[in-house]
């Protein structure tokens, strides 16, 4: 058992494992630890508990709280090792496939639907061939779709299951990681000054906590690499335009390299018969999309994201993405919507022009405006070229009536230097999930929690259980 750090107060509360963050990664880490018989687990979450999030709805935090960003996500479980993160850097293909299958079985046990989208291999292969002929790559994957309402139900079941086995504290933001002797994790310090000791600490701060993790990594001299920052727009079209694709794949992951800049543009979070929604990132407003399991609109929406990896000396991709989002908020109040035809003609959209378009916006509070005043030229040129290419696969995407919402930004700022079990350079300190740059989706985030928990469980076996609270 690790010795208590010298600066921890006498009588400090102690646990075997502290998990920072109650998103999919943190929840699955806690679940796997309990399955392995590890006791003395404390799960800390900066945001509100699930019941409070559901009461507040979208008026509360979209990213912080029980369930993390997953609580208000579209609820797509991508059952592919090629989609949703970078876990292939830490696992062999066989290990990752086993983790994905294990995570899928766990989601099914807690209420995920049996229906699988994208399981018609012949139809998917046909779409792949069509995309390849048009210089695009379609990444095949099977999906389970929870729907936004299904996410809340499933997270509630996980919360109830863990409640008797894990100490759960929401509204408890962590300020710092405490180190002990030999550069090992010794606990955490909360923002209110409370110190809590632990033998193991798992960091699962999610997208909401990625900036905090970057600060802590700098303070602890942990080596990091910069992840790409994804910036783009959300596209909304009649559902019939994308139906031949979504009927086969539900969500099409399509990658295209532009001729002009050779930048990668990709489709992301395709929402058949869904709606565009506004995300509040602590007063910074961006866009996203949802589909419900039982409520359908006449439209399909998806993001087009341009991925850029910055080189030295620039190391502030989060600040860069935030700057672009703030610019959109400054010009439009919150989120801007523009008809593609208006954008190509170099004019702003007005309420009148939006109203006479053939696509009725599902995000009614979006402000008609001019996205060319927001996105840097290179990003905008890449997206317009991608729309032209995609129109050859799904005619109608490049219509003058297509709606564009901006901006959509995915903040994945850094990757910590991690071992194969996701342990950092600090002994017994693990980093998992989206906030650590390990994953970009529900399944791989959950898998990262399982991987770290299994490593800790192996170390705990045979040790004196000590005086760990339950």
Where are these regions (language model features)?
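Residues forming the flavin
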Residues: 2-84, 122-470
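Dinucleotide-binding Rossmann-like beta1-alpha1 core, especially the glycine-rich loop
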Residues: 65-117
